[in-house]
Amino acid sequence: MEGGGGGADGQAQPVAQAPPAMQPMQQLSRYESQKRRDWNTFLQYLKNHRPPLTLARCSGAHVIEFLKYLDQFGKTKVHASGCAYYGQPSPPAPCPCPLRQAWGSLDALIGRLRAAYEESGHAPESNPFAARAVRIYLREVRDAQAKARGIPYEKKKRKRTQQQQPPPPPPPPPQHQPGAAAGEASSSSSAAAAAVAAEGSGSSAAAAAATSQTGGGGGGSTTTTTASAAAPTTATRV
């Protein structure tokens, strides 16, 4: 009988599916890795807090409490006001002043926790890391450490991108003034006229010299006649 048997041929064999390929884990940047560690540290702090504290009830005062708690793990020497090395950036000898968290480290930590709080789905308006009390506390820590360590903290100014201006045009070539050109032309004309006059006087002198020589050879009458002819006749006949 066909169809009566329930053997292996009549049953649908399940298709063996290949296991899903494991997607390579995206490597986090150094900032993202540090932000995740800081966030886990803060959540662990809330868990160990006495009395117990939830993230929803956390305020700016609790954040300041957390920052003071981290001071015990600090590595920055902050001199007390009565220390002999107060205000010296490089003390010559060790002192019993406590180690604290540096202001720069705390400021960067708050920035990462503020971003992690909002990335976890919480509203920015309820962000305890952005509270005004936290900003005031960080400012006080900065000023106190600057005086105690003798290292002023200067806020870095962002460099503004300056618009590239075209280079200035080259200076125009020097132009001759009309008066100067006229003066040069007149001086050139005067020089030319003086040269012509000099040539004329030279020719006259040469002619006179030649006449004198001719007269000397034939007798004194020629010289006298030439001189008389050359001199103007101003006398009037009576």
Swiss-Prot record:
Pfam families to which the protein is assigned, alphabetical: ALOG_dom
GO molecular function: DNA binding
Record motif Nuclear localization signal, residues: 155-159
Biased composition (Low complexity): 10-27, 177-213, 222-238
GO cellular component, one term: nucleus
Alphabetic keyword roster: Developmental protein, DNA-binding, Nucleus, Transcription, Transcription regulation
Pro residues bias spans: 165-176
Region described as Disordered: 1-33, 147-238
Compartments where located: Nucleus
Limits of the ALOG domain: 30-157
Biological processes per GO annotation: mRNA transcription; post-embryonic plant morphogenesis; response to light stimulus
PROSITE patterns: ALOG (PS51697)
Protein task: Probable transcription regulator that acts as a developmental regulator by promoting cell growth in response to light.
Family from the record: Belongs to the plant homeotic and developmental regulators ALOG protein family.
Name by which UniProt lists this protein: Protein G1-like8
Species per Swiss-Prot/TrEMBL record: Oryza sativa subsp. japonica
Gene: G1L8
